[in-house]
From Swiss-Prot:
GO terms for cellular component: cytoplasm. Belongs to the thiamine-phosphate synthase family. Condenses 4-methyl-5-(beta-hydroxyethyl)thiazole monophosphate (THZ-P) and 2-methyl-4-amino-5-hydroxymethyl pyrimidine pyrophosphate (HMP-PP) to form thiamine monophosphate (TMP). Mg(2+) binds at residues 78, 97. The lineage of its organism: Bacteria, Pseudomonadati, Pseudomonadota, Betaproteobacteria, Nitrosomonadales. 4-amino-2-methyl-5-(diphosphooxymethyl)pyrimidine binds at residues 45-49, 77, 116, 146. It catalyses: 2-[(2R,5Z)-2-carboxy-4-methylthiazol-5(2H)-ylidene]ethyl phosphate + 4-amino-2-methyl-5-(diphosphooxymethyl)pyrimidine + 2 H(+) = thiamine phosphate + CO2 + diphosphate; 2-(2-carboxy-4-methylthiazol-5-yl)ethyl phosphate + 4-amino-2-methyl-5-(diphosphooxymethyl)pyrimidine + 2 H(+) = thiamine phosphate + CO2 + diphosphate; 4-methyl-5-(2-phosphooxyethyl)-thiazole + 4-amino-2-methyl-5-(diphosphooxymethyl)pyrimidine + H(+) = thiamine phosphate + diphosphate. This is Thiamine-phosphate synthase. Keywords: Magnesium, Metal-binding, Thiamine biosynthesis, Transferase. It comes from Nitrosomonas europaea (strain ATCC 19718 / CIP 103999 / KCTC 2705 / NBRC 14298). The keyword S-adenosyl-L-methionine does not apply. Signal peptide: none annotated.
Length: 214
């Protein structure tokens, strides 16, 4: 378990929400995460679809230590057992994962639960009713990390903000050229992976994304 540190940021999901890339080299991954955190990431999701359970545990635990240093909440993608083992700040679940209500029973009231809602506003409404703390829509643009996903119209963000009382995250193919349009349409946060961790200067890229919310 990660040792206690300074209190985490308060409030709902907002700003730059970084999602880690699939990377087997833990040292390189942690270095990239450190740069992103130094650049102003507000929330970080650990996601590695290619790692086995042992590597995920090692990587998530080390990344959690980094997040604690920067007082940034760590959300674990999909794996409830991993989120519980490292005492992560939250869990993100997709369409084929456990329900937010079940996740809440296991994690307790103080953890953050996010739900992928693709292009489905009804699913987002149900997620909020089931106790989700935020919902994510997308992909809004072609994405290297979210292949074969639903295409979401930008207008969905405006509609969601009118219907929901929880933060809305946009995801899928987001870069510095299109993030501003999504933010202007009402999303509280943009979830970014390739445009951040694939940048030559990760820290600067994180700063540029963060400044879009100023």
């Amino acid at each position: 378990m990660v040792p206690a540190a300074e209190p985490m940021k308060q409030g709902g999901v907002s700003g730059l929400y970084a999602i880690t890339p699939d990377m087997a080299d833990t040292g390189r991954l942690c270095d990239a995460v450190r740069q992103a955190l130094a650049g102003g990431v507000s929330w970080l999701q650990y996601r590695n679809k290619t790692a086995d359970s042992r590597l995920r545990l090692v990587q998530a635990a080390e990344i959690h230590l980094l997040c604690r240093q920067f007082q940034v909440p760590l959300i674990v993608n999909d794996h409830l057992d991993l989120a519980m083992e490292i005492d992560a700040e939250g869990l993100h679940v997709g369409g084929d994962d456990i329900s937010p209500a079940v996740a809440r029973c296991h994690l307790g009231q103080d953890k953050i639960i996010g739900v992928s809602c693709y292009n489905q506003l009804d699913r987002a409404i149900e997620a909020e009713e089931a106790g989700a703390d935020y919902v994510a829509f997308g992909a809004f643009y072609p994405s290297m990390t979210k292949t074969g996903t639903y295409q979401a119209p930008i207008e969905l963000l405006t509609a969601a903000k009118k219907k929901l009382g929880i933060p809305v995250v946009a995801i899928g193919g987001i870069d510095l050229d299109n993030a501003g349009m999504l933010i202007a349409s009402g999303c509280d946060a943009v979830a970014v992976s390739q445009a951040l961790f694939g940048a030559q200067d990760i820290q600067s890229a994180a700063r540029y994304f963060s400044e879009l919310f100023d």
